[in-house]
Each structure stands twice: as structure tokens, then as C-alpha cells.
From Swiss-Prot:
Highest taxon listed in the record's lineage: Bacteria
Protein's name according to its UniProt entry: Putative regulatory protein Clos_1422
One Pfam family here: RemA-like
Family of this protein: Belongs to the RemA family.
Organism: Alkaliphilus oremlandii (strain OhILAs) (Clostridium oremlandii (strain OhILAs))
Amino acid sequence: MGIKLINIGFGNIVSANRIVAIVSPESAPIKRVIQEARERGVLIDATYGRRTRAVIVTDSDHIILSAVQPETVAHRLNSKDNSKEIESVVDGE
């Protein structure tokens, strides 16, 4: 069974299959996307009060804020060892 989960910091985990984009929050268009998501009620803030370093866009139009660098999240997304470790936890092994 292949549910791949990605740690986005502070023990928060997101389904890798649902991720559309991982971007930096610095540009004005991304800041607008964050504000619009906040107004629509689809913003998930997983920063624990820390500075937002990555913005994760999902296929359900949810916007997830993470305190982890976008490169780190992308590396975890591409890491095969990480997915096996988390899949073992999900499968109960």
C-alpha cells in the first residue's frame, strides 16, 4: 500500500500525492494567494509561530504554510528512504 507522507516540520505530515507545488512565500503573488486562502478558510498554518519559509499548494486548493525551506520539503518528497520509513509507520510495521 503506497501512501507517501512528507514531514513538513514540527511533526506535521502531508500526503505527497496531494502536493501540487512547493514555493517560497517571498513574492507578491504568493502573498496574495496566502491572503485569499485565509479569507476562504483553506489556509493551514503549520509554522508553530515561526517564520513561513515554504508554501505548499495542494490539489484541493488548500494552502499549507511550513517553517521548513522549500528545498528541504522537495528533498523529502524525492527521498525514497523517508517514504519507506513513514509508510512503515502508517502500515503498522
